[in-house]
Amino acid sequence: YTTILGEVYLNHELSNTENVGGYFSHHSSAGGIEGLRLDDDFTKTNLNIHYSQKLRDFSWKVDGGFDLQTYNWYGLPDGFYTDAQISEIDSGHAFHSFYAGGKLKFDDAIIKEGSVRFRRFGDDQDSGENRFVAKVSFDVPVQDEIISTEFYIDYISGSFDRSFNTTDELKYGNVIFGLAPSYQIKQDDLTVNLGVNLVYLNDNEFDESKFFIYPNIEASYRLVDEILIAYGGV
């Protein structure tokens, strides 16, 4: 069988502060495994393009791309289907997705960085999913100390043409709001990050909401300088 595999990376410096680049990959096979009763070819294609710029006080980057994939589910149990039934089976399945996002990073400000990303996923069986994620990291001064904090929103919604047991359309969706403050303590070779993750979850389809509190604690100790570090977290 014939297989094609290729990748291309491109990067170009437009100026001292601007950069543009891209990535393309393709992997496919014409199939031809002996003894199969169904098609077994597949393709995977990916494309990404990005642009970035670094200014005096901040830098930013935007990117976007898409993924295309086709597969064949060619496994069959012996003696379960007749030749007529096998000839009617459509074993192909195609997936596609596209995404776009951006990131902004400040060099010396209370707000350290922020990012957004949207992705749309679907297939040829009328399934689809949308996801949007936004994050912002900032420092909160408390007297002479700094509390590093991250706030994020994670939204997802999707649907299937039908559920497994019925022909009714199956939908799902929820949105998460999270706040994660953290305080760092350093003493000699010991570093401790004390934090907590506050999460609010709202289920859009079932009209339910929940609130969670998770510990976010990490500690590291340098046993041998630049060679061995002990680490633990919860």
Task: Name these PLM-found stretches.
Residues 1, 26-30, 66-72, 106-108, ...:
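Transmembrane beta-strands of outer-membrane beta-barrel pores
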Residues 1-34, 39-45, 58:
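Outer-membrane beta-barrel translocator/receptor signature
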Residues 2-4, 41-45, 92-98, 128-134, ...:
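Residues that define the transmembrane beta-barrel architecture of outer-membrane proteins
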Residues 8-12, 22, 47-53, 96-106, ...:
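Residues on the lipid-exposed face of transmembrane beta-strands in outer-membrane beta-barrel proteins
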Residues 12-33, 150, 172-203:
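Surface-exposed extracellular loop regions of Gram-negative outer-membrane beta-barrel proteins
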Residues 13-16, 53-57, 106-110, 140-144, ...:
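Outer-membrane beta-barrel strand-turn architecture
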Residues 20-22, 60-64, 112-116, 132, ...:
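Transmembrane beta-strands of outer-membrane beta-barrel proteins
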Residues 29-50, 61-131:
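Flexible loop and strand-edge segments within Gram-negative outer membrane beta-barrel domains
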